[in-house]
């Protein structure tokens, strides 16, 4: 019998491949996204120092109830505001191996509208 492909393993493989080609610096940190079944998490990471500079997720109090896409828009806004407050205006977007569609696209568009350039 043919086994069904594990979508998460395929995504992780895609993410490893992309991460080999991009990394965040102090000048232009990496905006990383993790999407779970229930929430979405975003971090601005300086890979050289190995430090998270700003983060936001659906676990934050500012994120109210709504659809997952609406929550992703709020998370994008929060992470952009927190990054801009720390003097970060340009980032490298790391979609985490996910397709640029739906919640990932909503978060990215919201972050762009609130001051991040990528």
From Swiss-Prot:
Tagged with keyword RNA-binding: yes
UniProt KW keywords: Ribonucleoprotein, Ribosomal protein, RNA-binding, rRNA-binding
Database matches in SUPFAM superfamilies: Translational machinery components (SSF53137)
GO terms for cellular component: cytosolic large ribosomal subunit
A molecular-function term among this protein's GO annotations: structural constituent of ribosome
Keyword rRNA-binding attributed: yes
Domain of life of the source: Bacteria
Chain residue ranges for the region called Disordered: 1-24
Matching InterPro entries: Ribosomal_uL18_bac-type, Ribosomal_uL18_bac/euk
Annotated disulfide bonds: none
Biased composition (Basic residues): 10-20
Any single Pfam family the record assigns to this protein: Ribosomal_L18p
CDD domains on file: Ribosomal_L18_L5e
Secretion signal, residue range per the UniProt entry: none
GO biological process, one term: translation
Function summary: This is one of the proteins that bind and probably mediate the attachment of the 5S RNA into the large ribosomal subunit, where it forms part of the central protuberance.
Description of how the protein assembles with itself and partners: Part of the 50S ribosomal subunit; part of the 5S rRNA/L5/L18/L25 subcomplex. Contacts the 5S and 23S rRNAs.
Protein family membership: Belongs to the universal ribosomal protein uL18 family.
Record protein name field: Large ribosomal subunit protein uL18
Species for this entry: Streptococcus agalactiae serotype V (strain ATCC BAA-611 / 2603 V/R)
The encoding gene: rplR
């Amino acid at each position: 019998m043919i086994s069904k492909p594990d979508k998460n393993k395929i995504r992780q493989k895609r993410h490893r491949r992309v991460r080999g080609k991009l990394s965040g610096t102090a000048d232009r940190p990496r905006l990383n996204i993790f999407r779970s079944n229930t929430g979405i998490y975003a971090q601005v990471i300086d890979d050289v120092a190995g430090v998270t500079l700003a983060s936001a997720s659906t676990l934050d109090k500012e994120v109210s109830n709504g659809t997952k896409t609406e929550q992703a828009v709020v998370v994008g806004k929060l992470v952009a505001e927190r990054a801009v407050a720390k003097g970060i205006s340009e980032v490298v977007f790391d979609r985490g191996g996910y397709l640029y569609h739906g919640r990932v696209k909503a978060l990215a568009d919201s972050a762009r509208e609130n001051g991040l350039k990528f």
